[in-house]
Structure formats: structure tokens, C-alpha cells
Regions:
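Short, flexible coil/linker elements and helix-boundary hinge sites characteristic
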Residues: 16, 143-144
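Nucleotide-sugar donor-binding patch of glycosyltransferase catalytic domains
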Residues: 35-36, 67-143
Length: 144
């Protein structure tokens, strides 16, 4: 959730990491050291990600760019099965555990789109992931 990313960003900054935010300009207001949301083209975005120490985010175009350049990172998944998106051994993922509905996006009839309809009505796949789980995985990536 947006609040979790804000807490995560603050924790990374406390540890001395520089947080650069990329993506669309309507994304959440996560605090960052350099805010490039809505300010880069594909070439500029690629340059920023290619030179990053690590990528942290969701299943998105920037995550795929990070994998293309073999940038280590952590990606957070909910309704999408990570095995359909992760191609780099350096990209780790975090998802809620023990939910029968994980990967529900792939069980929807065509045309399969990311819709706000959740089988549990509570988006457990996102809400059950804790900031501590996220931070633990990020620290593993940063230390490797």
C-alpha cells in the first residue's frame, strides 16, 4: 500500500540510502531524495535504473527495465503470479503467503485485466505483506 511504501522509504533513508522515485506523476506521495515521477522519458528512466544500487517497487515497466539491466531488486506482487514476471535471478519478490487466491489475475476470464475486483474483497495479497517483510527482503538484496 502507499502508506507502507512511505514507511519503507523513510526507513531506507534512515539507513543512509538515497531514494529516487520514478513512475507516473500521479503515483503516491512517497518521500524521496530525488523525485523524478512524471519527469523522465524511457531513455532517462533506463539510465536512472541502470545506475541504481537496487530497484524497489511493484510489477511495472520500471521493474522490467531493472531486470533488463540486471539491477538487483525487490518487487512486490499481489494478484499477479511472480513466476510469470521475474526473469532475473537478481530480482527477488515479496508476496503474501498462504493465500489460496494468490495469482487470481491469471484465473480471470479473457480479456484478463487488472481490475479492482478482489476475491476476498480485502486485497489480502497486498495488505498482509508487512513493512518488516519488505525491509528484510530489501536488506538481503542490498547485502548480496
Amino acid at each position: 500500500s502507499k502508506i507502507k511504501f512511505d514507511i519503507l522509504s523513510a526507513q531506507l533513508q534512515k539507513l543512509g540510502h538515497k531514494v529516487i522515485c520514478v513512475g507516473s506523476n500521479h503515483d503516491n506521495q512517497t518521500t524521496c531524495d530525488l523525485d523524478l515521477r512524471g519527469k523522465t522519458n524511457i531513455s532517462q528512466l533506463s539510465y536512472v535504473i541502470k545506475n541504481a544500487k537496487a530497484f524497489v517497487g511493484i510489477d511495472s515497466f520500471p521493474m522490467h527495465v531493472a531486470q533488463t539491466f540486471d539491477v538487483p531488486g525487490v518487487c512486490f506482487f499481489g494478484s499477479i503470479n511472480p513466476s510469470t514476471r521475474i526473469i532475473s535471478e537478481k530480482m527477488k519478490y515479496v508476496t503474501a503467503v498462504n493465500l489460496q487466491c494468490l495469482g487470481c489475475h491469471h484465473r480471470k476470464p479473457a480479456p484478463c485485466t487488472s481490475t479492482p475486483t478482489c476475491e476476498t474483497q480485502f486485497s489480502d495479497c497486498i495488505n498482509q505483506v508487512t513493512v518488516a517483510q519488505m525491509m528484510d527482503k530489501i536488506q538481503q538484496v542490498l547485502m548480496s
